[in-house]
UniProtKB/Swiss-Prot annotation:
Organism of this sequence: Homo sapiens (Human)
Tissues expressing the protein: Muscle specific with lower expression in other metabolic tissues.
GO molecular function, one term: protein phosphatase regulator activity
Gene name in the database record: CNEP1R1
Taxonomic classification: Eukaryota, Metazoa, Chordata, Craniata, Vertebrata
Membrane topology field: Multi-pass membrane protein
Residues found modified as N-acetylmethionine: M1
Name used for this protein in its record: Nuclear envelope phosphatase-regulatory subunit 1
Record bears the keyword Iron-sulfur: no
Protein family per UniProt: Belongs to the CNEP1R1 family.
InterPro entries, sorted: NEP1-R1
């Protein structure tokens, strides 16, 4: 394989990698927004739950029953984590990190957008 073919292969790989990472961005943004909204709802509900003087006087489950906003948002947040939202919000970073691991064997790397970074060849002495 000559250097021209190698350059074309690298360009094709880079183009496909950047395209793939770029296509993940909208979905990642939506997952991040969902996580932020549910986290803020949970924090707000937790604050209201904690400052309620009735919470200290009743049992734990009764206090949760008295604060359905907190209970539902907390269950939703836990459900999202079980569904893997923590992986979905960082999916492009995971892909880039895995590519960096593989590309390191070939003295290359890539940035978070998928652009290839060619490293100088190590000098063998």
């Amino acid at each position: 394989m000559n250097s021209l073919e190698q350059a074309e292969d690298l360009k094709a790989f880079e183009r496909r990698l950047t395209e793939y990472i770029h296509c993940l961005q909208p979905a990642t943004g939506r997952w991040r927004m969902l996580l932020i909204v549910v986290s803020v709802c949970t924090a707000t509900g937790a604050w209201n739950w904690l400052i309620d003087p009735e919470t200290q006087k009743v049992s734990f489950f009764t206090s949760l029953w008295n604060h359905p906003f907190f209970t539902i948002s907390c269950i939703t947040l836990i459900g999202l984590f079980f569904a893997g939202i923590h992986k979905r919000v960082v999916a492009p970073s995971i892909i880039a990190a895995r590519c960096r691991t593989v590309l390191a064997e070939y003295n290359m790397s890539c940035d978070d957008t998928g652009k290839l970074i060619l490293k100088p060849r190590p000098h063998v002495q």
